[in-house]
Amino acid sequence: IDLIGSVTAEVIERSRVPVLAIPENTPFKQFSEAKRIAFITNFDQRDLIAFDSLINNLKSFKFSVSLIHLSDVQNTWNEIKLAGIKEYFQKQYPQLEIYYDVVKNDNLLSSLDSYIKSNHIDIMTLTSYKRNIFSRLFNPGIARKMIFHSDTPLLVIYGRPN
């Protein structure tokens, strides 16, 4: 599984098109099965562009989206920013159900896993900014665990430079 994980991580890091990484034993067959998609944001402008791309590419499917920000501390400003992003996209896509949450980043893998389970998330989505996709959002070891030791598919969208 390590070799497969390494190859998948390399594909994700080098790709300039969206990549859907599906863990080996995940019973995921098609996008129409996905009812809840989580989108991790770091409040970067490229996240908003990637979110727009996600919605436009999947507009023929029926699903809801949870905007997630990972934070070490409880910060009201993060909630305000997420609420603003939700409001902006709710106007752009009135038919789309959008939620938002700040996930405490004290134990990333455990926190995300708990969030995924309690919110019935079918796909985790994040934006890659540079060649090294995980350097800004995650500790590489945790990211590898998240991708390859999770049953949740991961959709990575390349964030075009501003």
What are these regions (language model features)?
Residues I1-E10, L126-H149, N162:
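Glycine-rich, Arg-bearing micro-motifs that act as flexible, cationic patches
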Residues V7, K81, N107-D113, I142:
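Short acidic active-site motifs
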Residues E24, H69, T127-Y129, Y158-G159:
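Short secondary-structure boundary segments
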Residues A38, S64-I68, Y99, L155:
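A structural signal for isolated positions on well-ordered beta-strands in alpha/beta enzyme cores
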Residues Q45-Y93:
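Redox- and metal-dependent alpha/beta enzyme cores, enriched for Fe-S-associated oxidoreductases
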Residues Y99-D106:
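Short beta->alpha junction loops
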Residues N119:
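Active-site charged/polar residues at nucleotide-handling catalytic sites that mediate phosphoryl
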